[in-house]
């Protein structure tokens, strides 16, 4: 927590920007829909487009915190400490992933874009929150400095939005996008909104894919560092 407070940019990213996103969504989108062009039919798509920025933002924070600690050789020091490095990293990622989950859970309540049962929404929110450690680990595996990390975050931000194009593809070709983990999250969310029931196949594939991704990323991160 001290590292977040120490770096004002990360503080803004972790706490203020998600709030700004929520306020913008609550006020601006309904105004546009009422005064410029009707947008109600696209609210679910807009919800997915905007809510994913929350785990991506917290992933940005995790990535830079880990990079700071790597530059300060803290991760090397942890090799000889009673607490294992993996335990420390899990604590780091769990803390910010929980914060991400809280914002994601509050998002439908505070924005009003969709009406959804929060208990039914919870598995989808958990899947979205798993993007937080995923993004942070990828950035630290690929990038060797913060300049490169910014480029990686920008690229990954675009990649995780690609599954939204599935809603404009009317055949099974859309499942080619299933290699991107949050594709299954979006599919599960869309099914829940349309039917009122969970699609456990989409959820199951989503959780399995995220777990595999995180396991591979942990392995690659430890191998690099």
Each PLM stretch: what is its role?
Residues 1-5, 188-189:
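A short amphipathic helical element positioned immediately N-terminal to and/or at the very start
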Residues 42-80, 84-107:
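Hydrophobic alpha-helical transmembrane segments of multi-pass membrane transport proteins
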Residues 47, 55-60, 90-91, 116-124, ...:
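Short alpha-helical transmembrane interface motifs in multi-pass membrane proteins
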Residues 24, 187-225:
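Alpha-helical transmembrane segments of multi-pass membrane transporters/translocases
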Residues 30-41, 111-116, 186-195:
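Membrane-interface helix termini and inter-helical loops of multi-pass transporters
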Residues 8-11, 127-162:
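A structural motif at transmembrane helix-loop-helix junctions in multipass membrane proteins
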Residues 3-31, 45-61, 153-166, 204-214:
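Hydrophobic alpha-helical transmembrane segments of multi-pass membrane transport/permease proteins
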Residues 85-86, 93-144:
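Alpha-helical transmembrane segments and their short interhelical loops
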């Amino acid at each position: 927590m001290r590292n977040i407070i120490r770096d004002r940019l990360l503080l803004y990213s972790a706490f203020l920007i998600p709030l700004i996103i929520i306020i913008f969504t609550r006020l601006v989108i309904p105004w546009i829909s009422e005064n410029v062009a009707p947008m109600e039919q696209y609210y679910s798509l807009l919800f997915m487009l905007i809510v994913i920025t929350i785990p991506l933002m917290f992933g940005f924070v995790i990535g830079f915190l880990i990079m700071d600690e790597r530059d300060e050789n803290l991760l090397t020091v942890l090799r000889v400490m009673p607490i294992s490095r993996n335990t420390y990293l899990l604590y780091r990622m769990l803390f910010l992933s929980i914060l991400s989950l809280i914002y994601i859970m509050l998002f439908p309540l505070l924005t009003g874009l969709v009406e959804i049962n929060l208990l039914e929404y919870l598995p989808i929110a958990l899947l979205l929150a798993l993007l937080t450690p995923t993004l942070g680990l990828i950035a630290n595996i690929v990038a060797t400095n913060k300049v490169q990390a910014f480029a990686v975050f920008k690229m990954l931000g675009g990649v995780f939005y690609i599954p939204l194009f599935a809603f404009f593809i009317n055949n099974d070709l859309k499942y080619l996008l299933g290699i991107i983990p949050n594709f299954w999250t979006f599919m599960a969310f869309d099914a829940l909104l349309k039917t009122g029931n969970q699609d456990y196949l989409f959820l199951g594939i989503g959780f399995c894919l995220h777990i595999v991704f995180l396991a591979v990323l942990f392995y690659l991160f430890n191998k690099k560092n």
